[in-house]
Amino acid sequence: MKRRLDDQESPVYAAQQRRIPGSTEAFPHQHRVLAPAPPVYEAVSETMQSATGIQYSVTPSYQVSAMPQSSGSHGPAIAAVHSSHHHPTAVQPHGGQVVQSHAHPAPPVAPVQGQQQFQRLKVEDALSYLDQVKLQFGSQPQVYNDFLDIMKEFKSQSIDTPGVISRVSQLFKGHPDLIMGFNTFLPPGYKIEVQTNDMVNVTTPGQVHQIPTHGIQPQPQPPPQHPSQPSAQSAPAPAQPAPQPPPAKVSKPSQLQAHTPASQQTPPLPPYASPRSPPVQPHTPVTISLGTAPSLQNNQPVEFNHAINYVNKIKNRFQGQPDIYKAFLEILHTYQKEQRNAKEAGGNYTPALTEQEVYAQVARLFKNQEDLLSEFGQFLPDANSSVLLSKTTAEKVDSVRNDHGGTVKKPQLNNKPQRPSQNGCQIRRHPTGTTPPVKKKPKLLNLKDSSMADASKHGGGTESLFFDKVRKALRSAEAYENFLRCLVIFNQEVISRAELVQLVSPFLGKFPELFNWFKNFLGYKESVHLETYPKERATEGIAMEIDYASCKRLGSSYRALPKSYQQPKCTGRTPLCKEVLNDTWVSFPSWSEDSTFVSSKKTQYEEHIYRCEDERFELDVVLETNLATIRVLEAIQKKLSRLSAEEQAKFRLDNTLGGTSEVIHRKALQRIYADKAADIIDGLRKNPSIAVPIVLKRLKMKEEEWREAQRGFNKVWREQNEKYYLKSLDHQGINFKQNDTKVLRSKSLLNEIESIYDERQEQATEENAGVPVGPHLSLAYEDKQILEDAAALIIHHVKRQTGIQKEDKYKIKQIMHHFIPDLLFAQRGDLSDVEEEEEEEMDVDEATGAVKKHNGVGGSPPKSKLLFSNTAAQKLRGMDEVYNLFYVNNNWYIFMRLHQILCLRLLRICSQAERQIEEENREREWEREVLGIKRDKSDSPAIQLRLKEPMDVDVEDYYPAFLDMVRSLLDGNIDSSQYEDSLREMFTIHAYIAFTMDKLIQSIVRQLQHIVSDEICVQVTDLYLAENNNGATGGQLNTQNSRSLLESTYQRKAEQLMSDENCFKLMFIQSQGQVQLTIELLDTEEENSDDPVEAERWSDYVERYMNSDTTSPELREHLAQKPVFLPRNLRRIRKCQRGREQQEKEGKEGNSKKTMENVDSLDKLECRFKLNSYKMVYVIKSEDYMYRRTALLRAHQSHERVSKRLHQRFQAWVDKWTKEHVPREMAAETSKWLMGEGLEGLVPCTTTCDTETLHFVSINKYRVKYGTVFKAP
């Protein structure tokens, strides 16, 4: 089973990676569940130095069944034990793997007894276990994700080891093999055992707990009374653990205490103590293998994801340099093979590749990549220490050198403790035995305590002697401290190497010997003026590790760098640069090759064009390089021809061979002479008089050979460009054909409208409202002229179908030429068979003399066979605001959808042809007016330059030629590729819409065949014709409600007819010259009431309501006894009835019709009934109105007269009432009050009374103007 490493990492580290192109291949070595050789451990006794150790073997006792073998191949990675490790530990390498162990004091008699023994883990163990989890829970991915979350929480120290055991046991309930297999990753002293009753026994250092798999809290049990030595399978630990040493203190940011005195002991923690609470933690060793990167500086636990992270980081960093990545894999593979051979030989074999050599090779491979090399150094800490010791470089000397390729960290310019870098911290042993503890937070800016001993404490040799000489030479402690400050700011990359030399020149300038040694030590050269910081070179690939998708956005092309990103230093910036230059926003391009959208990727034809251009460019570079070398050597040859023989013998060339570039000529010669190029170049420099003519002849010969090849390639490239140019521009054609075939399927068209219908139903149910009424689809027929072209193509294909009967062909012809134009308010087509008479042959049967025709009908049948001779839709063609109504089944619906798509695509091609005609005319007009050139249609520049073949079709004939090509494609006279190429030549990138024209027409013909042959389809057509005679299939929109009863009857009949399939309501609406087709899927499922009595009552109610004669004799009798009408209304009704009777007697029916012609009415008032209460509710925005056209004019004319008469009647009533009820004194007081007089306490004001006329009536208008109110003091 092959595995991608990033698959294992992505659930936990999804936010840390941006994108890994392709699969992250595993390292090429055989996957093994367990190491074949016994693991080798180290024990440190109290009498030993930390750099030495005793090696001994322990027979492994692994549970092989818990870790099934996998056949996948993976690279070296961490197999980390998830433990609560909170104090630094000594690291000692051995062979190919580093096993970390803590030594505790023990009696001298048994130095080995009491040592913590544990197994060696590899990344293969962890990945195999994950494989088993995936396989076991393949249908439950959440379980796998929960397991990774548990591991992530443990890594962040959110839970302790017992908590992990409890959660894993609960998660893998019912899978004892997985629970037991987790023992492989537990620290010594912990063990899980599954009982038969689903109880889980957990052995911890000092106690045994039982955990039921249903999640009950652990129950402590007495510890075992017989201490036993733990095996590699994490056997139970002794009841009394060994005393623990105190936490080691960090003496330097990158150093780790290797050993502490055994006399200092602290009691162990309880087994279930939190890992965060006390400073002293229980002893939990950590197992590290090759490829391990534990973050030990912050005392964080280790897990195998770190190794996978590191592998992915390397591959991302060297994406453009796959050779480096492959070389790295080869180094690890070779080292692992050597270690395997050494183990199998049992100590009789000495590995050819040691850890130091592995580190040195990787260091050369990852030069200038400080972070990668530093992190790799964590996997080989002793090799790293050996390299550092071999260099014998003090810490501050390393800072001076600014060598970022090693693992030495620079001091920080703050008083805070050094934090781990982005890629992990680094571990380095002190070269001597033990170091007294120092402060954890060194104040690095305080340089007053700096001394030569501090500077050279970890180094020796000439570097230490140099600092001693500098201190003695400067004599002043302050000057020496300032010198050290210069080194510190250089170490922080605040200044460059050249600036450092300038800063220390006042100190060392007086001592040339020291100054020269210092510059040589820095690698400083006088000619180097511009320098690239190693830190910047080391972080070239950091951009690949930033997750830009989660960063702040500015538009679609820019992302803001995270605040945690460390900006590179720049010493050349001025304050103005810092103010105006951008350090936050970075460009975030979206490459077409990396895009997940198919439409944005390059097509195969674009790739062909690009490949041609790449090949052309590459050959041009070869030719121009060769030509440049020829010119240089020709100049040298001319120069030599003017020299004497002695001068020629003395003449020499430099590395540029007489030119200006060394690289160009060297590449040209290497291309020809390959491995012998170095000898040729050496001969040209030392003896040009002999070598130049020979090399020049060879170069010219190659020039002719390559020029000839270029001419041959130009023909090939031109053919490929001509073949793929138009196809490369068409980025939609490839996907369009495949997708359009799916869209045109009957099932897709039905699913489209059914999904819209279901969405409406669900929305109405959620909102607890009625289902909205209206069409589900609205389609447009923009040009009626296209209907003729569509009908011609369809009939053309129908005639050539031998499976369709003669009568059915004629019915289809009538539908396309008569019925469809009537529905769409277009002019009918001609049924004459002129085309058939011209194309088809007449076969005379000699025996009977009968006339036969192939693939068609033998002439137009008599008029009696016409299906659509006279329809009401014909009369609506020239009118506006009209509609046609047609209830159809599935076949008719699919046909109308396909027909609309066909008309739409024909219209787009026709419109494009018209646009190209206009562009051609404008171009000719411009050439004639501006350039004074008058050219023919076929005299385009491309044709004259023979870059394009002249076309047989003029631009004006593009659309007719397109229709002819469609007919030829339907007949099989041309293939689809030729058809598509011709379309691209005519319509360029707009031609893709017609690529599936043949499939579309074939689908239409299949539906037409069903329409004329299927029984239900024929009945649908017959029902339309029958209801058309009754006036129920359309008319004017403003009189639609007058036909509502007829249309409802038509709908009920259609629903009954199509009870077994969908029923669609098609409305063809013509408004302002545009034809719109609306389609509504009707709900034909009848809701049967549970109570038959209620159903009967509802039916009776509807019938009585719809009946015009709703007044029963009983109701009339009841109303006569107890009238509920106003007498005046009864009088008006009787008067109208008498007037109607009188008109009928006088026979004035003609005048009545004439009177009704001058009336405008709208009957669109709608109402709904609530089934529960029979309550009628009017629909919003529905209304009725009726008025005579002369009523408004008559109202204007009589308005004044009527207004005066009404006012006089009202005024007479008011005067009469006032005379009876209002005395004169009250009327006088009212007049005074209106004028602001007569009453005290009124606000001072001035009132005026003016007489105005409003609506032909005189009125009094009072205006009040208030004065200022003065208050008494």
UniProtKB/Swiss-Prot annotation:
Interaction with HCFC1 as annotated region, ranges: 119-196
Residue numbers bearing the Phosphoserine modification: 10, 277, 832, 860, 940, 1089, 1112
Keyword match Signal: no
Record-listed cross-link Glycyl lysine isopeptide (Lys-Gly) (interchain with G-Cter in SUMO2), residues: 122, 134, 563
Modification N6-acetyllysine occurs at: 469, 865, 875
Disordered as annotated region, ranges: 1-23, 87-110, 205-297, 398-446, 1136-1156
Region spans: Interaction with REST: 205-480
Matching Pfam families: PAH, Sin3_corepress, Sin3a_C
GO cellular component: chromatin; histone deacetylase complex; kinetochore; nucleolus; nucleoplasm; nucleus; Sin3-type complex; transcription repressor complex
Name of the protein in its database record: Paired amphipathic helix protein Sin3a
Biological classification of the source: Eukaryota, Metazoa, Chordata, Craniata, Vertebrata
